[in-house]
Regions:
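Conserved acidic
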Residues: 19, 23, 92-95, 99, ...
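Mobile beta-alpha loop/short-helix "lid" or hinge segments that flank ligand
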Residues: 71, 75-76, 168, 184-186
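Poly-acidic low-complexity segments
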Residues: 47, 137, 184-187, 191, ...
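Conserved amphipathic alpha-helical segments that form helical-bundle/coiled-coil interaction surfaces
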Residues: 113, 117-178, 187-197, 201, ...
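Membrane-interface catalytic loops of GT-C/OST-like multi-pass glycosylation enzymes that act
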Residues: 181
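Short linear motifs at protein or domain termini
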Residues: 1-113, 223-248
Length: 248
């Protein structure tokens, strides 16, 4: 059975399922997961009364969570209309991938200057992990891929870049899972090994060009999939139900 995304996915599942939520942070985590996995229908106004009832909480922590998620870009806030989940459409996906490319290319250039051999050895081990993950399910591939790219950005030794990537990973996780779950394994894992070699050679130019091509290929594939349409992307799918622990 295919597992659905939510990494760091496995620990989150138990925390999201089960008894009514009691803290503002848990309400925030639950609603964020519902938004990311499209358990809330995109572009439709969120019914706060119904959602509070469903979660077993009052309107106060729920409104706090909605405000926070809107500020972080997970929800859209509209005057006199409330909150809604951003739709999964090609334009939004393009925006996210453009941001990711700009961020990771910049980080790679800094890493070529700043990374030490120990850090590159760790990155090499993570590149091998992504190669081994291709025989596993999409969730394992996604976890390995995220670990590689996160460590690469960490090698830039720039805390703001790393913080931005982690936030971006959360917003893109379901999109990237669709790519891995529906697509065929490609040569993207070999490109990770090449990136490590280019970083060891301190060849920032070639590394940046490879990163741009690497991300653009993934963008092209996921955009094509979204245009084709997948019913399970949106509310009511069993994949979201499994990760959130509620009925489809």
């Amino acid at each position: 059975m295919t597992r659905s995304p939510g990494a760091d996915p496995e620990p989150a599942t138990g925390a999201l399922a089960g008894a009514p939520l009691r803290s503002a942070d848990r309400v925030y985590a639950r609603v964020k997961a519902m938004a990311v996995f499209y358990r809330l229908r995109p572009s439709e106004r969120i019914n706060e009364v119904e959602l509070a009832r469903r979660l077993g909480v009052s309107r106060t922590p729920l409104r706090e969570a909605l405000n926070r998620l809107a500020a972080e870009g997970f929800l859209e806030a509209t005057v006199n209309r409330g909150y809604s989940v951003l739709p999964l459409d090609p334009k939004r996906v393009l925006t996210l991938y453009e941001y990711r490319a700009t961020l990771e290319i910049g980080a790679l250039r800094l890493a070529a200057e700043r990374a030490d051999e120990g850090g590159l050895d760790q990155l090499d081990a993570l590149a091998r992990r992504t190669q081994h993950s291709t025989g596993q399910d999409a969730l394992a591939q996604l976890a390995a891929d995220e670990a590689f790219h996160t460590h690469l950005v960490a090698l830039a030794d720039n805390a703001e870049m790393l913080r931005s990537l982690r936030s971006l990973n959360e917003r893109m996780r379901f999109i990237r899972w669709i790519d891995l779950d529906k697509g065929q394994p490609g040569h993207w894992t070999d490109e990770h090994a090449t990136m490590v070699a280019l970083l060891r050679a301190r060849d920032a130019g070639a590394g940046a060009a490879l990163m741009q091509a690497h991300i653009t290929r993934r963008l092209d594939r996921i955009t094509e999939m979204i245009r084709a349409g997948f019913a399970e992307i949106y509310t009511g799918n069993a994949l979201a139900a499994r990760i959130l622990g509620d009925a489809a």
